[in-house]
Amino acid sequence: MKVTILLENTVCRSDMKCEHGLSIHIAADKHNLLFDMGPNAMFLENAEQLGVDIKAVDIAFLSHAHDDHCGGLELFLKRNDRAPVYLQKEVWGEYYVVTPDKCEYAGMDKALHRFDDRFRLTEGVTVIDDELTLFSGGMGRDYWSHANDTLCEKVGDDFPKDAFRHEQDLLVTSGGRTALFAGCAHNGIVNILRRAEEILGRSPDVVFAGFHLFNPSLNAPEPRALIDAVAGELKARTNTKYYTGHCTGLQAYRELKEMLGDQIDYMSGGSVFEI
């Protein structure tokens, strides 16, 4: 399995562009996959620099409805006219960032409904084939990140906290190894790992995910106690390797690295990993 980070908040190559968002290309035994499309066309530009043919993608996935992951979806659908895109069925909700200073829509562009024939809506565990499994829901709320606190869903005239029902995660089994892909892990990376373990009967070999440990409303990482607790859970899975970035934040990554050492590394835009 070859994993290429098309877009992330940072870059490891001078010929790449970066922006707050995430897009990952996965070349597996049976499939040529795209996981998230970032906020705009930048993932396409970077793909060209990296020699990744977006037209050759045969299946795509959206981790959740936030615009830093789905903003490039329309551009993908226009560039690639054949790949189905798997979406959790709650992606069409009204998702907002709500702070004392703003109430800003951060969800899917409803104009994308014109591509409904390309979309495959999922719920719970969806086994696509022996290589690909999607899952959502059925998770606890341990190690909850308060970086989620400004994320809301509009329901009538109210803005309750987002329950992240629209978030889904992907398991890819290829070459005898299983990788877990999670966009922002709003539901908590530990909770997502536990659900993946229930499905697999073991821990995944590799994890690629943002851990949502940077709080943008405070411009600061989550408290060290939370980061240490998450690190302890990750470290206990001694045979699992982690690649993180995006909403984890650089300071939180450094703190995780202190505890996990070689068990964790950063996934900058332009990084290529052979699994």
What role is predicted for each listed range?
Residues 42-93, 198-207:
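Active-site metal-binding motif and surrounding structural segment of the metallo-beta-lactamase
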Residues 69, 163-169, 173-269:
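Cap/insert and terminal regions of metallo-dependent hydrolase folds
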